[in-house]
């Protein structure tokens, strides 16, 4: 009885990962996280005005969140880019660049 290697399941795992990511992306894109406004028949999640003979509702919709400034994400990206650039230029007494001439043998 010859020994055989176990089957390769990497493609199966890759397909499962793509399917799971697709399901999560579709779920996140179709889920509404807006607050519920109105009654069981009339929903105004984006704001609006409704009135009939017995009831009326006026809702202006969700506004921007005042606790996070609008320029903060751009500022964080800029700080990260500058930090990465500065860390690549600083000398931490470790030479990561190859200074040997093994790859440059044009004289031979």
Curated annotation (Swiss-Prot):
The protein in question is named: Movement protein TGB2
User: What additional remark is attached to this entry?
Assistant: TGBp1, TGBp2 and TGBp3 seem to act together for cell-to-cell propagation. TGBp1 is the main movement protein that physically cross the plasmodesma with the viral genome. TGBp2 and TGBp3 would facilitate TGBp1 function.
Q: Tell me which Pfam families the record gives.
A: Plant_vir_prot
Q: Where is this protein localized, as stated in its record?
A: Host endoplasmic reticulum membrane
Which parts of the sequence lie on the Cytoplasmic side of the lipid bilayer?
1-14, 86-108
Residue stretches spanning the membrane: 15-31, 68-85
Q: Does the keyword ATP-binding apply?
A: no
User: Membrane side Lumenal: which residues?
Assistant: 32-67
Which domain of life, per UniProt?
Viruses
Q: Which GO terms describe its biological process?
A: transport of virus in host, cell to cell
